């Protein structure tokens, strides 16, 4: 189900100049005044694909990656979509662009690996620790988190990289973009994985998008793993070994949300500092990647595809917008509860969250019916 011709695009056609120690994509300058994205994974995909003539919205990429199926394995600090490589694998298996992901191995990987993938002529993305992004103080001063940016150029002589960060949250929480240089040696200290398009991407039809969306909603409802076949996954055996070694059961989708919220009960017995920390992490995880993105992207997806989803799409939009507002209110309440050490609020928070999860499932089931009909 992979799209696109399996051939390498010459570097010269992609707007790049290269020599033995550097490569620069001049087209990246067009992104300097672009609107910031809503999430680093999908905004970096969006801008990378657009450079090759494929215009896809973040909401479409979110659906294509199956990212609505948030995962929970028993750690309240960790809740959200699958790991970065697995999301990209889901996208390719759903008929979307094929992207290869390689782990960055300390002491083995170096700048020549980055130069190699840049010279393939297709978009390159870096999954990094935010502390390595020394081009902005907000990354250096705050808690380290995973972040995805585009790599658009290298100058090995100057030891700089040209990057496009399309979802930079400043200290006030305002999203903006950064297009410019990054210190290469700092950057390489934090790379987790690097990824690149392996072939010319092709835009999916609305029917293909709807089929993938319906499939992933069914995953959300049932909690089942993906059953796609024929997608390269060099790390598959290692990932399975890692999962077996942890001995933890990963719950996905609706079941993942319910297990996550059920464990809020553990907050009541925590020491004060731990209580504050966990409430902040819960707030962060609901805000980025799970509930708030799910509802926002659902509304946007339906708005973009009303013509093919039919008049009932408006009802789903209204459900999504209402849910977004209520998740936002509850999430702020969780944040304030942590700051104020109001542990007695936890039963109320759990009850409100479970109600929202029920409404969320109802919304997605409505969308699943519409996408299944539109995919036929």
At which residue positions do the language-model features occur?
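Detector for intrinsically disordered, low-structure N-terminal pre-sequences
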Residues: 5, 10, 22-27, 249
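Acidic, Ala/Val/Gly-enriched low-complexity intrinsically disordered segments
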Residues: 5-6, 11-13, 238, 244-245
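Conserved active-site-adjacent core of cysteine acyl-enzyme catalytic domains
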Residues: 13, 17-56, 60-202
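Charge-dense, low-complexity intrinsically disordered segments
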Residues: 35, 203-207, 211, 251, ...
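Residues that form generic nucleotide/phosphate-binding pockets
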Residues: 51, 117, 216, 263, ...
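Noncatalytic regulatory segments and standalone regulatory/sensor domains
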Residues: 156-289
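Charged, long alpha-helical assembly modules
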Residues: 282-376
């Amino acid at each position: 189900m992979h799209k696109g011709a399996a051939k390498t695009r010459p570097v010269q056609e992609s707007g790049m100049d290269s020599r033995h120690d550097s490569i620069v994509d001049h087209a990246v300058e067009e992104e300097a005044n672009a609107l910031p994205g809503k999430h680093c994974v999908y905004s970096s995909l969006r801008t990378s694909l657009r450079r090759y003539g494929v215009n896809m919205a973040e909401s479409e990429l979110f659906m294509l990656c199956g990212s609505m199926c948030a995962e929970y394995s028993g750690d309240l600090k960790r809740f959200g979509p699958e790991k970065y490589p697995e999301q990209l694998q889901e996208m390719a298996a759903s008929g979307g662009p094929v992207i290869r992901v390689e782990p960055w191995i300390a002491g083995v990987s170096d700048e020549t690996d980055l130069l190699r993938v840049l010279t393939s002529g297709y978009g390159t993305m870096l999954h990094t620790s935010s502390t390595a992004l020394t081009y902005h103080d907000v990354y250096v001063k705050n808690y380290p988190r995973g972040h995805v940016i585009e790599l658009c150029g290298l100058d090995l002589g100057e030891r700089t990289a040209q990057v496009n960060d399309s979802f930079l949250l400043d200290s006030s929480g305002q999203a903006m973009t950064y297009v410019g240089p990054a210190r290469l040696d700092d950057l390489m200290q934090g790379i987790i994985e690097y990824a690149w398009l392996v072939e010319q991407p092709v835009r999916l039809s609305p029917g293909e998008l709807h089929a993938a969306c319906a499939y992933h909603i069914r995953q959300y409802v049932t909690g089942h793993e993906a059953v796609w076949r024929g997608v390269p996954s060099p790390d598959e055996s290692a990932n399975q070994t890692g999962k077996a070694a942890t001995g933890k059961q990963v719950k996905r989708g609706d079941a993942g949300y319910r297990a996550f919220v059920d464990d809020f009960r553990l907050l009541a017995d925590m020491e004060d500092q731990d209580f504050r920390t966990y409430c902040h992490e819960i707030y962060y995880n609901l805000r980025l990647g799970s509930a708030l993105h799910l509802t926002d992207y659902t509304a946007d997806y339906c708005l973009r595809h009303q013509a093919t989803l039919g008049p009932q799409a408006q009802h789903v939009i209204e459900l999504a917008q209402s849910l977004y507002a209520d998740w936002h209110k509850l999430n702020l309440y969780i944040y304030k509860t942590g700051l104020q050490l109001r542990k007695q609020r936890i039963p109320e928070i759990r009850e409100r969250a479970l109600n929202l999860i029920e409404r969320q499932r109802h919304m997605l089931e409505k969308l699943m019916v519409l996408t299944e009909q539109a995919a036929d």
